[in-house]
């Protein structure tokens, strides 16, 4: 029958979901994202892998490169049914992001290629490869509730000392009196 994993990729920072990024059959998953941006951009990607355990004992880790530089991908939740990964990184203009589980060239050629223009808020599948990929934007509410919950994000952010969560900061017009702001609450 063959191995059939399921991989969904959520580009949280751009509210784009790429569904079924796995190969039709085989123990491999990944894609190429051509990101077009005119400025520096903080990116957050969540990967949801639902492994097919019928013929394998372990799953291959998801790896990622942005313009040839390795990017950390961290497991934030793991169960028998799914493995959820997260990655936060910054791009500085146009970038090519390779997401993969295999490094051999033959397998990588089967991965889909997606263009995402951040400035114009447009995306398109250039090559679907050997997948049934489709794109949703915005990310549907069920996926947001299931995979983008605060406890996942907090757990990931707390494990990364270099990551600053700007949403937790108290910014207001008179930024000099944060202690007074806490007293008023």
From Swiss-Prot:
What InterPro entries does UniProt report for this protein, alphabetically?
A: Poxvirus_C7/F8A
Pfam families hit by this protein: Pox_C7_F8A
Q: Does the keyword ATP-binding apply?
A: no
Instruction: Please give the biological process terms from Gene Ontology that the record holds.
Output: viral process
> Keywords for this entry?
Early protein
Q: What family, per the record?
A: Belongs to the poxviridae C7 protein family.
Task of the protein: Plays a role for multiplication of the virus in different cell types.
Name of the protein in question = Probable host range protein 2
Classification from the root reads: Viruses, Varidnaviria, Bamfordvirae, Nucleocytoviricota, Pokkesviricetes
